[in-house]
Amino acid sequence: MTKALDGVRILDFTHVQSGPTCTQLLAWFGADVIKVERPGVGDITRGQLQDLPNVDSLYFTMLNHNKRSITLDTKNPKGKEVLTELIKTCDVLVENFGPGVLDRMGFPWEKIQSINPKMIVASIKGFGPGPYEDCKVYENVAQCTGGAASTTGFRDGPPLVTGAQIGDSGTGLHLALGIVTALYQRTTTGRGQRVTAAMQDGVLNLTRVKLRDQQRLAHGPLKEFSQFGEGIPFGEAVPRAGNDSGGGQPGRILKCKGWQTDPNAYIYFITQAPVWEKICDVINEPDWKTHAEYAKPAARLKHLNSIFARIEEWTMTKTKFEAMDILNEYDIPCGPILSMKELAEDPSLRATGTVVEVEHPTRGKYLSVGNPIKLSDSPTDVQRSPLLGEHTDEILRQVLGFSDHQVAEIHDSGALDPPRKAAAE
């Protein structure tokens, strides 16, 4: 079966997490992703957070599936020639270098366009144009500068970053959409273009509901926040609201049976207005259906703490899965707090390919997250990440059409090997 992006060739200069997230997704959809790596070193994450000695780390393997690896010294004259040929034959160049790195390599946008006018150059940066555009950005910096940290945590505590990698992986997903959109536009224009995704912008996009709340705040208190019911005044900016729901439907994380010893024995419970009477039945508070302080959503806002305290009395008598089974029968929105161990062992996630087991030649079997997007006509077959330089000769011969003699010349030039250090005097 053909894949959605069959025939699309990606020149992948990305590293660490944000860029590899993007190119891995494109590879899962069938693009031929050629990962260009520094000879002898490769992507820095190959050696970061290693759990086993002398093998590629899970940090690397889980972000670089379905790709091919070529090692290339782009400072070497022969290496520059090879890179020029790759630019000629590829559709997209993806990079997450610091500002100006491509220019210093000798391949600014104008030169790339002269080599291949159809090439799309896609970049991830920390910030867009402005006072911070030259600053180095990592995941947590992006969360802090994009509005996520200031609105995450509890009101009386410090800002918090989230466990979800919304800065790195989130921006990578944004860039992938931009690339596919640019490829589609190229079918009508016939030319390439630049695609840029800034990490600050990506995080802000994912926290847009907080920008919504910032504007609402100018017209009065945010009544769905628990501090409204507690009579605590709001300040000038959207506050941290703990586990209050951000969608206008009051919700909290509540303890379940076993919470004293299990750090994840909790459930998220939403008191959705259409099922309020069912909630009253479940927790055995039938009078709340008609009580003036509880019957209407607006009236309940001032009593959320006492309402959820009563609901928690009920959830603490059930395991999180027992509570979920009961609540689902009444169509009450809820969800158990699932640990990474529980997710890794969930058979339904294995069945859908959301969690996959991958065989690797040096580290053996490991688990990874598969493609979260399912296409009926382009199913994803997750293949292991490449070893460093594993496909170098294959790419030189099959993609660029070099002869054995030409490949030997490139090897002899040192373009595929670590730069030689000068001998000590």
From Swiss-Prot:
Residues involved in CoA binding: 17-18, 38, 72-75, 96-98, 104, 136-139
Annotated organism of origin: Rhodopseudomonas palustris (strain BisA53)
Name used for this protein in its record: Formyl-CoA:oxalate CoA-transferase
Group of enzyme by EC: transferase
Family per record: Belongs to the CoA-transferase III family. Frc subfamily.
Binding site for substrate: 247-249
UniProt GO MF annotations: formyl-CoA transferase activity
GO biological process, one term: oxalate catabolic process
Subunit structure: Homodimer.
Lineage: superkingdom: Bacteria
Pathway noted in the entry: Metabolic intermediate degradation; oxalate degradation; CO(2) and formate from oxalate: step 1/2
